[in-house]
């Protein structure tokens, strides 16, 4: 009987050990699944941060370029004003020609970097134009541009300066 008792006890211990091992295995599997999930989420978050940083880098570069181009528009305005001054003698004509060449070169370089003049003819568009004042005009339909007061510019399809215009009532 003692041998049967021992066999029964061994079987009980084996079953108990087997249950303990199964419980331990389930715990380890759950812990593994949790760690795997945490890893996958952290990896996805890292990839999202990487993509966001790349977009912010591109955006910062574009903004810096837009800011620089916007600053150059004052130079364009000054050169255009100088070209529009009447030249009376040969020296003034030569200076005016040099200023015109400088203006043309600057405009080519701006265009190379996607800076374009906003069309300021036809119907007023509040997305592109800034109405400085409204005027009566027999020659223009209502809500159409009468006069360009200051050129507007776009860069990469974004307005860097609205065209300042007068608009027919």
From Swiss-Prot:
Gene Ontology process terms (BP): protein folding
Coiled coil regions, renumbered to chain: none
Annotated GO CC locations: cytosol
Chain positions covered by the region annotation Disordered: 1-25
Subcellular location: Cytoplasm
Entry superkingdom: Bacteria
Protein family membership: Belongs to the GrpE family.
NCBIfam families reported in the protein's UniProt record: PRK14140.1 (NF010738), PRK14159.1 (NF010756)
Protein purpose: Participates actively in the response to hyperosmotic and heat shock by preventing the aggregation of stress-denatured proteins, in association with DnaK and GrpE. It is the nucleotide exchange factor for DnaK and may function as a thermosensor. Unfolded proteins bind initially to DnaJ; upon interaction with the DnaJ-bound protein, DnaK hydrolyzes its bound ATP, resulting in the formation of a stable complex. GrpE releases ADP from DnaK; ATP binding to DnaK triggers the release of the substrate protein, thus completing the reaction cycle.
Subunit structure: Homodimer.
Name under which the protein is recorded: Protein GrpE
Protein species of origin: Campylobacter lari (strain RM2100 / D67 / ATCC BAA-1060)
Gene from which the chain derives: grpE
